[in-house]
Amino acid sequence: MEPRALVTALSLGLSLCSLGLLVTAIFTDHWYETDPRRHKESCERSRAGADPPDQKNRLMPLSHLPLRDSPPLGRRLLPGGPGRSDPESWRSLLGLGGLDAECGRPLFATYSGLWRKCYFLGIDRDIDTLILKGIAQRCTAIKYHFSQPIRLRNIPFNLTKTIQQDEWHLLHLRRITAGFLGMAVAVLLCGCIVATVSFFWEESLTQHVAGLLFLMTGIFCTISLCTYAASVSYDLNRVPKLIYSLPHDVEHGYSWSIFCAWCSLGFIVAAGGLCIAYPFISRTKIAHLKSGRDSTV
């Protein structure tokens, strides 16, 4: 096999591996994971003996259940008078006062991808029971369309506006991530086809075009992965922090799906570099050979 054909075959193999890894990353849901077990253990140690005896054997104490008997929303008054609009007032109005403490939020182990966010089963019996009884869904779809949130009474308008704007910016980041990954797959597939054609027709030209397509795929992947990292950071830093941020002892980070995407990026950049660099290397060798022959003559 000629050296040029060998380089084309190697770059085609790398591009096919990259395509497989990229498709695997897109259609799996393990891009980002959270594990609050260490956080719950520390909360249980700090809360030991604080719960009444009739709640110690419950899966979830009454104070942490999402549904509690409370007066209708219209009958509840803001603490401190009707004109008060500080965060403490609307938090207590919505029953969110217990979220101020780090142990007041019901946190569960989750994993998420581009399309869904799911709960891990077998880690927390609270969420396992809720899912088995049909009270909670194991997986929920990640939104790629903007839906107007419900306007709750007695919540400061500035806070509502901030939440809506953050949701809109996060939606744009998600769309950029998914859109550029889709374009990366399409361009990579075209590059594989062109690299295959190079075995039969205009090897030099088609190899160069395939290399350009591979490098373009790498650019799209880089934009998409950086945008995804930005969306995760943006989501964790949204306000109000008591709802969107995570306690410091909750383990969270990227998982194997996004590492598949990064490996795909590495393979495709290597394939594009081979296709682009080989013609220049071969020309340099030919020039050296010609100069050597001329010197001997």
From Swiss-Prot:
Signal peptide extent: 1-25
Expressing tissues: Highly expressed in the bone and its expression increases during osteoclastogenesis.
UniProt topological domain (Cytoplasmic) ranges: 201-208, 279-297
Main location: endoplasmic reticulum
Superkingdom to which the source organism belongs: Eukaryota
Bias type Low complexity, positions: 68-79
Gene Ontology terms describing biological process: negative regulation of osteoclast differentiation; regulation of cytosolic calcium ion concentration
Keywords in alphabetical order: Endoplasmic reticulum, Glycoprotein, Membrane, Signal, Transmembrane, Transmembrane helix
Transmembrane segments: 180-200, 209-229, 258-278
Cross-referenced Gene3D superfamilies: 1.20.140.150
Keyword flag Transmembrane: yes
Membrane topology qualifier: Multi-pass membrane protein
Subcellular location per the Swiss-Prot or TrEMBL entry: Endoplasmic reticulum membrane
GO cellular component: endoplasmic reticulum membrane
Ranges per topology, Extracellular: 26-179, 230-257
Region Disordered: start-end pairs: 41-86
Ranges of biased composition (kind: Basic and acidic residues): 41-57
Function, in words: Acts as a negative regulator of osteoclast differentiation in basal and inflammatory conditions by regulating TNFSF11-induced Ca (2+) fluxes, thereby controlling the induction of NFATC1.
Similarity field: Belongs to the TMEM178 family.
Annotated protein name in UniProt: Transmembrane protein 178A
Source organism (scientific name): Mus musculus (Mouse)
Lineage: Eukaryota, Metazoa, Chordata, Craniata, Vertebrata
